Amino acid sequence: MGDIRKIVFEENKLEKKLCRLVGQAICDFGMIEDGDKVMVCVSGGKDSYAMLDLLMKLRERAPINFEIVAVNLDQKQPNFPTNILPNYLKSLDIQYHIEEQDTYSIVKRVIPDGKTTCGLCSRLRRGILYRVADELGATKIALGHHRDDILETLMLNMFYAGKLKGMPPKLRSDDGKHIVIRPLAYVPEKLLERYSADMNFPIIPCDLCGSQPNLQRQVMKEMLRDWEKKHPGRVENLFRSMHHIVPSHLMDGEAFDFKNLEISSELSGIAARSSGDRAIDEADLDELACGTLIQGTYNPPL
């Protein structure tokens, strides 16, 4: 009996932590507003299932009113079980829509065997989801990318594209007509793995990206997990650095006007928080060495 109580306690503790992280991200970035209709994109993977579940829980206790409509894009992948998602969504008693579009055949026809399919697949999906959002009258489009996805994107851009660029928690589409949000932006993947197992979500594997083990993104994922094991706090601080950008100590002339930099007796704005001549903030390093700076799971600023 004691073991069962302990399991239930741990499950409730995890759910509360996830709700807090998702709620914090929503507040920090103004993701959801009163009267919004949020189109929650559900792929059949652990992340999107968890996102839908957590948004439904938060909606019950939120001080604002917003609608949820779950949307799945059936890309006609071989062996895709067409009944699992409709049955699951129907059991939740929420509005949902299944969009059937054979993007799988297009991707397989255009991309040679052995080449990465993610780029074309994501572009096709994006266009379809934008259209569906218009048809459903959705004001926000929620995607299930989590903290680790954001860090992997940051490192991919740094290592392979030479850009200091990540994956934003909230963005406006290129056509200016849609707002995309990522409510799981603060959530580490390992917590979603635990939550998915606890909730027993009916996971559906992807026969496109899920069958490409040598992707560079997978290399980044393994690197992050190795860091978490060998260097506690490193991944959390890497993520924290995305919240504390100091353009004056980088090299982008568009982000900081180096050419017109002059001697001044007063500092304001970015210059005031640039730490002047210091490239390394020793106080933070001292705290980290003492084990007092961001240990364990990332906690966003309150």
Swiss-Prot record:
Note on cofactor: Binds 1 [4Fe-4S] cluster per subunit. The cluster is chelated by three Cys residues, the fourth Fe has a free coordination site that may bind a sulfur atom transferred from the persulfide of IscS.
Pathway in which the depicted protein is active: tRNA modification
SUPFAM superfamilies named among the record's database cross-references: Adenine nucleotide alpha hydrolases-like
Protein name per the record: tRNA-cytidine(32) 2-sulfurtransferase
Family stated for the protein in its record: Belongs to the TtcA family.
Binding of [4Fe-4S] cluster, residues: C118, C121, C209
Reaction catalysed by this enzyme: cytidine(32) in tRNA + S-sulfanyl-L-cysteinyl-[cysteine desulfurase] + AH2 + ATP = 2-thiocytidine(32) in tRNA + L-cysteinyl-[cysteine desulfurase] + A + AMP + diphosphate + H(+)
Gene source species: Polynucleobacter necessarius subsp. necessarius (strain STIR1)
Assembly and interaction partners: Homodimer.
